[in-house]
């Protein structure tokens, strides 16, 4: 007899996410992903000055704010054919790399680690043994027995107080939890240390962006960061050196803690290298422009199909016609009018709610396709496209994780296993490791260019009072490819659409009734305890929807069986 699990709400970003699963014989047989809140931000920016849009649309999300801001500015600059000063590109790139580093660290430790780590088990750990386990694996200075003892005592104090605080309401003791006590203790210690590390990443964003979240320094035409090495109120030498100090600290944590912990989780949960396979078509945008027209990048983009790297088709610029012409959104299963696929520049956002229907409309999220196909975006897509493009540093970082995995298990991690729940987490770690090189590279490039006497960070845009101009701003955000599509008519915005990573991945069935990436990734997942569907949460978290969710389980007649809180 089948059961139905409803997880509602799931995510705190891009509105609210509801997941429904049918379970037969202990395995997910069908799934539905539903966005349960209408965003409507596209309607808000219509009839406004295109220079104002970035400040408004970064409020689409309270976590990945910076990405929406930069994508919107790029859309306006694309429409107006603006050549951005290279210093502005360097500053934007540093902000984006630091922001994404922050996002990836928060995802792994604060948002998804507790799907794999049993806090209560850490109470049984031997701190000396925990420290010894990391000998020859990590040189992190806080991996000592003394540090682990301090953390264990903190956990004991929390338990004794009866108030677990941030560790309350977890699935402690769940049969799917497999880490030994010492590894659980290590993970809890790193969880707490990550809180300080992510703060350092945010400091880089705030020092350049003015604040975080919701940076204030962008402008259509560059950035509002005047450079004067001798002036207190500008981007001067002292501030640049201060920023560099945080960049250096980030790299140590990412390499010696985050990367190692990723390999450890994979080593103790090898079955999750076989589960969670989603859409096998992957799409990624090139990122970190090194010229003023977004035509040359540090990271390549691309598209590949059927999980086959040999099908890779490079995407070399943000003006690539192959990329622009392939994107459509349909609303056959979403609560909007105009169900047929639409190109974003002609897209509409007219709500038409008429209730939930498994076979009809069930989401406020549209269904994007790339040349008619469902695709997955995100760090896994990013990693696979860079591997297919032959990017050496990507292969190096992946090989380092594979080597750690092999050292811990004696087994080889195969490429086919990356199309999985843990494959997404590995892809995110590889991305974060590479971002540390980007931070150093772009900081040094900025310093060198300033040393040549180039202090330019902004060019004044010319917005014609008549005529129509279209632009698109692509960006490889922490959760995948983001694009903002702007139409400027007679000096104001006449149409605006944002196709965000969560749209690509959490979209409902598309115009051809093909399931979305979230939905596909859940099918075939075994569920040990329907009252505690931890396995569903693990896979959804692997896409990084930043969630704290209330789980409701119902029986075949629709009656609620249990209500629990999931971290």
PLM regions: where:
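Metal/cofactor-centered catalytic core regions of large enzymes
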Residues: 1-567
């Amino acid at each position: 007899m089948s059961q139905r699990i409803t997880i509602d709400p799931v995510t705190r970003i891009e509105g609210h996410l509801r997941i429904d699963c049918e379970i037969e014989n202990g395995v997910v047989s069908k799934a539905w992903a539903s966005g349960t809140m209408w965003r409507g931000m596209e309607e808000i920016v219509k009839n406004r000055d295109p220079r104002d849009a970035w400040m408004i649309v970064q409020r689409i999300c309270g976590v990945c704010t910076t990405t929406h801001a930069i994508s919107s500015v790029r859309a306006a600059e694309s429409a107006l054919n603006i050549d951005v000063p290279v210093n502005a590109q360097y500053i934007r790139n540093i902000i984006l790399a630091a922001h994404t580093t922050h996002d990836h660290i928060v995802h792994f430790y604060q948002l998804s680690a507790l799907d794999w780590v049993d806090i209560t088990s850490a109470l049984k750990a031997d701190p000396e043994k925990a420290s010894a386990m990391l000998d020859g694996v990590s040189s992190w200075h806080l991996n000592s027995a003394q540090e682990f003892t301090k953390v264990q005592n903190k956990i004991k104090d929390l338990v004794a107080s009866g108030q677990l605080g941030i560790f309350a309401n977890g699935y402690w003791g769940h049969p799917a939890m497999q880490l030994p006590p010492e590894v659980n203790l290590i993970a809890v210690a790193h969880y707490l240390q990550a809180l300080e590390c992510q703060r350092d990443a945010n400091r880089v964003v705030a020092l350049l962006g003015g604040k975080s979240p919701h940076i204030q320094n962008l402008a259509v035409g560059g950035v509002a960061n005047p450079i004067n090495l001798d002036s207190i109120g500008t981007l001067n030498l002292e501030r640049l050196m201060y920023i560099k100090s945080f960049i250096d600290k980030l790299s140590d944590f990412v390499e010696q803690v985050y990367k190692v912990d990723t390999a450890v989780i994979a080593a103790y949960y090898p079955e999750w290298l076989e589960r969670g396979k989603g859409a096998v078509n992957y799409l990624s945008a090139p990122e970190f422009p090194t010229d003023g027209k977004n035509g040359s990048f540090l990271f390549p983009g691309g598209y590949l199909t059927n999980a086959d790297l040999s099908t890779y088709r490079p995407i070399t610029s943000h003006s690539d016609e192959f990329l622009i012409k392939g994107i459509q959104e349909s609303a056959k299963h979403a609560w909007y009018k105009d169900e047929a696929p639409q190109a974003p520049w002609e897209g509409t956002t007219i709500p038409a709610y008429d209730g939930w229907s498994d076979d009809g409309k069930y989401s406020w999220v549209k269904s994007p396709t790339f040349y008619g196909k469902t695709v997955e975006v995100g760090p896994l897509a990013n990693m696979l496209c860079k591997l297919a493009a032959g990017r050496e540093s990507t292969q190096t970082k992946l090989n380092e994780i594979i080597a750690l995995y092999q050292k811990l298990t004696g087994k080889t991690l195969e490429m086919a296993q990356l199309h999985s729940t843990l494959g997404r987490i590995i892809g995110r770690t590889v991305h974060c490791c590479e971002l540390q090189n980007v931070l150093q590279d772009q900081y040094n490039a900025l310093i060198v260019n300033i040393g040549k006497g180039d202090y330019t960070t902004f060019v004044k845009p010319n917005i014609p009072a008549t005529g129509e101009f279209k632009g698109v701003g692509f960006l490889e955000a922490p959760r995948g490819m983001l694009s903002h599509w702007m139409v400027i008519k007679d000096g104001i915005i006449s149409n605006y659409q944002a196709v965000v990573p969560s749209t690509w991945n959490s979209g409902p069935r598309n115009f051809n009734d093909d399931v979305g990436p979230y939905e596909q990734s859940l099918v075939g997942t075994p569920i040990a305890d329907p009252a505690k569907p931890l396995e569903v949460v693990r896979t959804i978290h692997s896409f990084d929807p930043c969630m704290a969710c209330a789980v409701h389980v119902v029986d075949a007649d629709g009656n609620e069986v249990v209500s629990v809180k999931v971290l």
